[in-house]
Amino acid sequence: MSPQTETKAGVGFKAGVKDYRLTYYTPDYETKETDILAAFRMTPQAGVPPEEAGAAVAAESSTGTWTTVWTDGLTSLDRYKGRCYDIEPVPGEENQYIVYVAYPLDLFEEGSVTNLFTSIVGNVFGFKALRALRLEDLRIPPAYSKTFQGPPHGIQVERDKINKYGRPLLGCTIKPKLGLSAKNYGRAVYEVLRGGLDFTKDDENVTSQPFMRWRDRFLFCAEAIYKAQAETGEIKGHYLNATAGTCEEMLKRAEYAKELGVPIVMHDYLTGGFTANTSLAHYCRDNGLLLHIHRAMHAVIDRQKNHGIHFRVLAKALRMSGGDHIHSGTVVGKLEGEREVTLGFVDLLRDDYIEKDRSRGIYFTQDWVSMPGVLPVASGGIHVWHMPALTEIFGDDSVLQFGGGTLGHPWGNAPGAVANRVALEACVQARNEGRDLAREGNDVIREATKWSPELAAACEVWKEIKFEFDTIDTL
């Protein structure tokens, strides 16, 4: 770094470049209850000291820039700057560190995930002094979280709305995801709901394509819901995807869903954006609609271990932005998800108060105060043989979603739904009787096949289907 040079134009201002660590590395700093805290996994470029790199992260994500500027003297940097207050090496990794940064609350606009992310995960991720940077966790203080509405309704209100308690909810994504006409799509929805599932779902890329315009799909799905409700006596729903190219069009679709009297709509919150998602969440709360969230594009952001944003941060952001359900991985299916890491962010979605637990990747204690919780949705390559593990892993406050695991049944859609409902009821009963689903799960399913031919057929079809690959996202 070049030395500072005294200028003639002003007293006290020194033009030039100085090390970030002289201003932004503060190991003696005691964090405040109102600070937003961040834990970054940082890999500096060769020859860059970790203190300088960590300070650069704090600077470039708060008040700093590459050189001293005149206007530094017009504000209080000590009040507004981010501070790198701790650095710890990552065990077993060379030249990799966990860097802790504290941000003053006044740096962020109230109720705006968009602004929060623009600062903390903005330009700093392209900084040349860093080989890689990943945001592992955020501590959101109550002083900030209380500026957000959060989920439109939350877990307890949803259960009261649909009058279903004491078990996970069951869903199904309609397949094939693209190409069906609206009428055939609605027929599949009806058959699955009639068979015993609670919800069906638009796939994330079903919006309003030439083969099925959104208004037609909404109409046929609403008809299917009402018909299935009349036959079963249960409240049913279909996640009608309101995601659109503009916020205005998205809200128009949500309004039409409300006019049809359906209980729930859906949004792709990462591709749609946080501003759109928060707008839709506010609309859903005001108009009594539940909001299902799909996380399409998340793996682009969170799958690389050394660079990006961990999903636990995206999950916290969604809870603040607003959603009643969000996809969270399965642990046992075809999609990425290590058990303890997954359970860590599932707790961050559902619980009011979550203790720091590094064994599950939770770097900070998080207190959500009174913000409603979000139901985690397990989906992706799951079938009836997974039901015991899913029930044991996710518990009652979850949605277990079987797409191919319902519609791939050899006897048809409704028998596929019957098989999943019977398997779930058997697992819940066994658990309530004190049986260990982790050890006895397969026996529970086999016993249930004796009085459910639909389940027996499903078990035969998927008895050898496994997705056994190494998990990338490990601690």
Swiss-Prot record:
Catalytic residues (positions): K175 (proton acceptor), H294 (proton acceptor)
Note describing how the cofactor binds: Binds 1 Mg(2+) ion per subunit.
Enzyme type, top EC level: lyase
Subcellular location: Plastid, Chloroplast
GO molecular function, one term: ribulose-bisphosphate carboxylase activity
List of residues that carry N6,N6,N6-trimethyllysine: K14
SUPFAM superfamilies cross-referenced by the UniProt entry: RuBisCo, C-terminal domain, RuBisCO, large subunit, small (N-terminal) domain
Propeptide: 1-2
GO annotation, cellular component aspect: chloroplast
A Pfam family this chain is assigned to: RuBisCO_large_N
Swiss-Prot/TrEMBL site (Transition state stabilizer) positions: K334
Alphabetized UniProt keyword annotations: Acetylation, Calvin cycle, Carbon dioxide fixation, Chloroplast, Disulfide bond, Lyase, Magnesium, Metal-binding, Methylation, Monooxygenase, Oxidoreductase, Photorespiration, Photosynthesis, Plastid
UniProt modification remark: The disulfide bond which can form in the large chain dimeric partners within the hexadecamer appears to be associated with oxidative stress and protein turnover.
Keyword Iron: no
Note: The basic functional RuBisCO is composed of a large chain homodimer in a 'head-to-tail' conformation. In form I RuBisCO this homodimer is arranged in a barrel-like tetramer with the small subunits forming a tetrameric 'cap' on each end of the 'barrel'.
Database matches in PANTHER family: RIBULOSE BISPHOSPHATE CARBOXYLASE (PTHR42704), RIBULOSE BISPHOSPHATE CARBOXYLASE LARGE CHAIN (PTHR42704:SF17)
Oligomer status and interactors: Heterohexadecamer of 8 large chains and 8 small chains; disulfide-linked. The disulfide link is formed within the large subunit homodimers.
Protein known as: Ribulose bisphosphate carboxylase large chain
Source organism of the structure: Zygnema circumcarinatum
This protein's encoding gene: rbcL
